[in-house]
Each structure stands twice: as C-alpha cells, then as structure tokens.
C-alpha cells in the first residue's frame, strides 16, 4: 500500500491509503482457466494448484461430457467453497491478489466470456505438432490476457472444439500422452508461466 500520513493519535500515525499495488509475484499476463466440471472433488485440487501457478481467474463450465451437473443452489455452494480454497492458496503462495472463481457457466457462456481475451488456447488430444504449439505460446506477449480451455474427463466433443475455434480459440497439444483433466490445466499453466517469466 502507498499511504499518506493524515495525522497522529498519541504515539500512532493515522494513515490514508492512496494506492494499492500488486506484489510482483503476479504473472505479466492475466491468465484465465476455463475448466470443464470434473467428477468428485477434483475441482478443489484444480483451483488450489491453478492459484499457486499464478492464474488470474477460474471459470468452471459444464461441457457435454461433464458427468457432474449442478443446479443453481449446488453451484452457488460449490463456488463459495472454491473461492475459499482460492483465497487460502493465494495466501499460502504469497500472491498479490486472490483470483476470482466464477459461478459455474454453460459452455456457451464460457466462450462468450472468453471472447474479451486476447488469446484463447484449447489443448486438444487430437491436435498434433508441438512446434506449432510452441509458436502459438511464444507469440503471447506480457500484458495480453489469455484463456485456457480444459475439457472434463473424456475431453471435448469435436463440436465444442469447433465452437471454440469460431470464438477465436487456437488448438494446441500438450504432447503425445493423454492427460487427466486435473493435469492438463496445470501443464498448460506451467508452460505459460515459464514462457511469460522468461521474456
């Protein structure tokens, strides 16, 4: 905080906050993780690790292959729980801000939200070519906002991938192995963290 002394009360100074500044622990780009709803409590692990890796915000969404279906009441309770986990992870990892965990959205709502971002990455198990993927990632500049779309267990349906491409998404690969939903987002975030902090 940047403060100004307003006066004194006894032996204590009275300060007025002029400006809040973020710690320099933040990534040079705002990265949003769009996560297809996974089974069980996997979302809690995903939120915790994504926050530790520097994500700016998390948008859970229901994909066609999402097994979990949350009504409005359950979605609200989950969002409160996930936000508390994000707060704890941010404090533990020395973050300068607490990432926002959005309320669960439909896939269409998530794509609409992502249209405001500069770059949308869609790791897809049928995509090939690590060189093409690295070219896309290395073209991301500090200050650009980035969205990462991760499917639930079973991945995305081809129609969902097409919809993401129409919204400006770029398909990327995470290698020759098929990763679990809770691993894919962390892998992509790690690659971005390394790339952006190396510029």
Predicted regions and their residues:
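Short connector loops at helix/strand junctions that flank enzyme active sites
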Residues: 10-12, 26-30, 143-145
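Gly/Ser/Thr-rich beta-alpha loop segments that engage phosphate groups in nucleotides
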Residues: 38, 42, 149, 153-157, ...
């Amino acid at each position: 905080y940047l403060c100004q002394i307003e006066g004194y009360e006894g032996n204590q100074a009275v300060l007025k906050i002029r400006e809040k500044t973020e710690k320099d622990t933040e990534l040079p780009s705002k990265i949003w993780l769009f996560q297809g709803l996974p089974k069980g409590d996997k979302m809690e692990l995903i939120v915790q690790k994504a926050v530790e890796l520097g994500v700016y915000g998390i948008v859970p969404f229901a994909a066609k292959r999402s097994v979990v279906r949350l009504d409005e009441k359950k979605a609200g309770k989950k969002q409160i729980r996930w936000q508390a986990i994000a707060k704890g992870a941010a404090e533990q990892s020395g973050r300068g801000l607490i990432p926002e965990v959005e309320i669960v959205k439909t896939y269409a709502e998530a794509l609409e939200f992502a249209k405001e971002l500069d770059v949308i990455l869609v790791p897809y198990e049928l995509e090939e070519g690590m060189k093409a993927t690295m070219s896309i990632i290395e073209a991301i500049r500090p200050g650009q906002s980035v969205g990462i779309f991760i499917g639930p267990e079973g991945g995305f349906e081809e129609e969902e991938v097409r919809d993401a491409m129409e919204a400006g998404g770029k398909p990327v690969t995470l290698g020759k192995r098929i990763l679990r939903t809770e691993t894919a987002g962390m892998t992509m975030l790690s690659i971005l963290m390394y790339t952006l902090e190396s510029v």
